[in-house]
Each structure stands twice: as structure tokens, then as C-alpha cells.
A protein has these predicted regions:
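Short gly/pro/ser/thr-enriched loop/turn and capping motifs at secondary-structure boundaries
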Residues: 48-53, 132-134, 196-199, 270-272
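N-terminal capping/small domains of soluble enzymes
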Residues: 1-97, 102-104
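Short donor-sugar binding/catalytic loops of nucleotide-sugar-dependent glycosyltransferases
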Residues: 246
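Alpha/beta enzyme core
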Residues: 91, 106-241, 250-265
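Predominant activation on well-ordered alpha-helical scaffold segments within soluble catalytic domains
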Residues: 31, 82, 86, 149-153, ...
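C-terminal helical cap(s) of enzyme catalytic domains, especially alpha/beta-barrels
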Residues: 55-64, 200-214, 256, 268-293
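Short acidic/polar active-site loop segments enriched in Thr and Asp
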Residues: 39-40, 45, 95, 122-125, ...
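A short, charged, Gly/Pro-tolerant segment at domain boundaries
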Residues: 296-303
């Protein structure tokens, strides 16, 4: 059997498969379906300084080869995440978890990360500067190299945990933003978040979601994600987590060949909650099929 383990910012993962934030709750919900300790880790639901009720409904809609969502970072706020959600997770998950953090100001990001820094259960801070469906924050920090670097510096000043900056594809030059984050001290980069999209109901002549626009995800965005992972991973010297349209073991291998150290799986979890477990089970067979003995050896191996 091939070797599946990878090292992500100094922490060893049994395998590179990571359910993406926003598609896996706080983890314990999925523990009712299978043993989530089979995962490399997972990125829990995007957490903000204060509670958020999210956007008006409808906020999720299916479309060809994917879905559009504008949930709007609904979450109980960092205090409740620490007091209520993490203790529930500790009962069913014995690995380090990735905390996904969003904010509406540099101070928001720093405050939330400083709170989570005190939690032993948290192994990495995934700082989301790329949410396309909230107003007054989120993606605005991820579309400008200087703003992304400012958030990175602020977070690095309050934590000793690895900081991974999650980038938006809705930019003209993602490489410059990744390099700015690296220069500001980021320990890793994750990409891509969803593509900004919109669909209109022909009968009502209204957008299919109340927010009008939202994040498009699903198999259709895989080629865009692979391209951006390739570009960024060849421009920085820190680990890259690839995501976007991943739904099977072959997609994981493709992302790693493009340069990803680990791979997040998002929308596919909403189609089939067993997706990540199945990918992990399928990886040894796919590795054998393509003559891969050690996943670490193929990172960035595209010719």
C-alpha cells in the first residue's frame, strides 16, 4: 500500500484529504455517519468575532455542474464556538482541526485568531480573505495584495499556530496576492474559494438566490482551480492547499501534481456526505494504478 501521509506546515497528516469549511459543519455532525478520524483533518465552519445569522433565504441553488451559495457566514461567533462547538468535537475527533476565520476588519481577524490560538485542539488557522457573498468585508481583503498582507501580519502577531491564507479566484493576479501573503509571514496558502456567479429564474425573472450573486462551486470549477494552484505553488515556497471542484481520488492526485500539499473537498460533501471517506478509501487503488508509492513525491510533479 502506498504512503498517503503528508506534512502540512509542520503537522503530519495521515492523508491529504480535508473537508472544506462551510461543507462539514463543526465535524461532529458527520461523526454520526462515519469515523471522522479517517480524515487528514478538516476545516470547520467559518467563524467570526460576533454571531452572524447569514443572508436571507433562498441562499443555495443547484445549477449545471455545481451550485451557487450565499449563506453569508452564518455562525455562533468565536466565543460560542470555543465554549459549545469545540467540546462536542473533542468527543469524536482526536486530531488537530483547522479553524476557518473570517472578518470585516483587520481587528476582527486578529481578535478571533487570538481567541482560537489558545485552543490546543486547533492546529492551523485558515484565514478567509475570499468570501464572495458578504457585504463590507471578506473578499475585499483578498483582492488587494497590500490588504491581504495587512491581515496576514495582524494574525501572525497574535498566534504561534500556522497561518494559512485562503484566497479568492475573483482577481486578475492571484500570484501577486499569494506572494504578498508569504512575504507578510503566511505559513501556507489555500485556494480557490468559490467563483462569483449568478443565475436567474426564467419564470420569476428573479435571481435564484436572495443575495442575487453567490459563490459558484462544484466540478465545473476544477480546471480553474488546478490552473491557479499550479501558478501559486510555483511562485511561493510555502505549502499550498488546493481546492475547487474536487470530488474523487483522481482529482486529489491532479491537485497534488499541480503543486498542492493537501486537498480540500467542498461542494461534493453536500452531494454525498461520505465523499471524503470514499476518496481516502480509493486513494491507494488510484496510486497503484498510476505507479505512485508516496503522495509526497508527486507534489508539484506536473511535467
Amino acid at each position: 500500500m502506498g504512503r498517503l501521509s503528508v506534512n502540512l506546515c509542520g503537522i503530519e497528516l495521515d492523508n491529504p484529504v480535508i473537508p472544506a469549511s462551510g461543507t462539514f459543519g463543526f465535524g461532529y455532525e458527520f461523526a454520526e455517519l462515519y469515523d471522522i478520524n479517517c480524515l487528514g483533518t478538516f476545516s470547520f465552519k467559518g467563524t467570526t468575532r460576533d454571531p452572524r445569522f447569514g443572508n436571507p433565504t433562498p441562499r443555495i441553488a443547484e445549477c449545471n455542474m455545481g451550485m451557487i451559495n450565499a449563506v453569508g457566514l452564518q455562525n455562533p461567533g468565536v466565543e460560542k464556538v470555543i465554549s459549545d462547538e469545540l467540546p462536542k468535537l473533542a468527543k469524536c475527533f482526536n486530531k488537530k482541526v483547522m479553524a476557518n476565520v473570517s472578518g470585516f476588519s483587520v481587528e476582527d481577524y486578529a481578535y478571533t485568531c487570538e481567541k482560537l490560538d489558545k485552543e490546543d485542539q486547533v492546529g492551523w488557522l485558515e484565514v478567509n480573505v475570499s468570501c464572495p457573498n458578504v457585504h463590507g468585508g471578506g473578499m475585499s481583503f483578498g483582492t488587494n495584495p497590500e490588504a491581504a498582507a495587512e491581515v496576514t501580519r495582524a494574525v501572525k502577531a497574535v498566534t504561534t499556530k500556522p497561518v494559512i491564507i485562503k484566497l479568492s479566484p475573483n482577481v486578475t493576479d492571484i500570484v501577486s496576492i499569494a506572494k504578498a501573503c508569504e512575504a507578510a509571514g503566511a505559513d501556507g496558502i489555500s485556494l480557490i474559494n468559490t467563483l462569483l456567479g449568478m443565475r436567474i429564474d426564467l419564470r420569476t425573472k428573479k435571481p435564484v438566490i436572495a443575495n442575487k450573486m453567490g459563490g459558484f462551486s462544484g466540478p465545473a470549477i476544477l480546471p480553474v482551480a488546478v490552473r491557479m494552484v499550479y501558478q501559486v505553488s510555483h511562485a511561493v515556497s510555502i505549502p499550498v492547499i488546493g481546492m475547487g471542484g474536487v470530488s474523487c481520488a483522481e482529482d486529489v492526485i491532479e491537485m497534488m501534481l499541480a503543486g498542492a500539499t493537501a486537498v480540500e473537498v467542498g461542494a461534493a460533501n453536500l452531494v454525498d456526505p461520505y465523499t471524503c471517506r470514499n476518496i481516502i478509501a480509493d486513494l491507494p487503488c488510484v496510486m497503484d494504478q498510476y505507479g505512485i508509492e508516496n503522495l509526497t513525491d508527486i507534489i508539484g510533479g506536473v511535467k
